[in-house]
Amino acid sequence: IAAAIQGWEMRLLRGVAESALDGLFGLDRDGFAECESVDALFWIGPALTQEPSLSPRLCEGLAALPLAGAPNRLSREYRDWPELQRIHGLCRAPRLPARRWRVAPGEPSNDNPGLPLRPLLHRRRSAQRMDGRAGIDVGLLRAWLRRLLPERSPVPFAVTGEAARVDLLLFVHRVRGLVPGLYWLDRSGLRRPPMREDFLWQHVDPELPLYLLQEGDARALSAYLSCQQDIAGDGCVALAMLAHLGAALEEGPWCYPRLYWECGQVGQLLYLEAEAAGLSGTGIGCYYDPLVHELLGLTDESMASLYHFTLGRAVWDTRLCNMPAYPAMRRD
């Protein structure tokens, strides 16, 4: 998003194996108190139609550069997690074929005409509490959900060049013009696994793949599923991000962490959309994923709940002091 403001594009470079990236940036050398690794390599610059290739000579030259400075110690105490190290090794992407980078431009939107993006990026904060009273109009929710469709928002969803694999289970609490209950946003277009037979699957919007599953007050349910956190029930709407895990793993185990990347992209857009509307959002990392799967009637591991989120009017703690996120640079 920050690159797009400058007129640049950001794209994932797939032509170098992740394990080789550590050597390119010197993370495989002595002197590191903790094991560090490179997760991804990106191109940031003018728009290109095709992923550029990195020549072996360039890679060898980068790997031979001297390491400047000394690595910082990340923690006073280091705890070894061998199982996490094993999973990390299994999930590193190999060298992958290049892909075309040209994508269709996003559809223009007048949801927030004249609203500058830079201040939203600077002041974006996670809410700690929601007031439990504020509501939104259904038109605003539709605008938010339209923004989450990959074809509507190539920034940021075109960064990896991979198809969407994350759908959304919505807990609608206070949305004027939309009955409270459970909804499903089919943003990936992938085939759904069997779910509960009593779900309605009622299409509720001509412009969105949005379906009503079940009517009812879902505030207590959403709070309980998010580890009994009231913030999930006190917002206007909460959601669970469910990934098509089976389809991703068929392509390779390296797709697993990228499902979290996609959830992060969804969350970032929701943060900014909430700020633009004078509201706030917050990610919820503690939740009972087996109970979410049980709620939907999922009987296998083809889908998995990977992250939760909520949006509403924040209640700020007046004991906290706000400091500018990006203080002006000074020249002495």
Placement of each model-derived feature along the sequence:
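Acidic, surface-exposed loops and disordered segments
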Residues: I1-D332
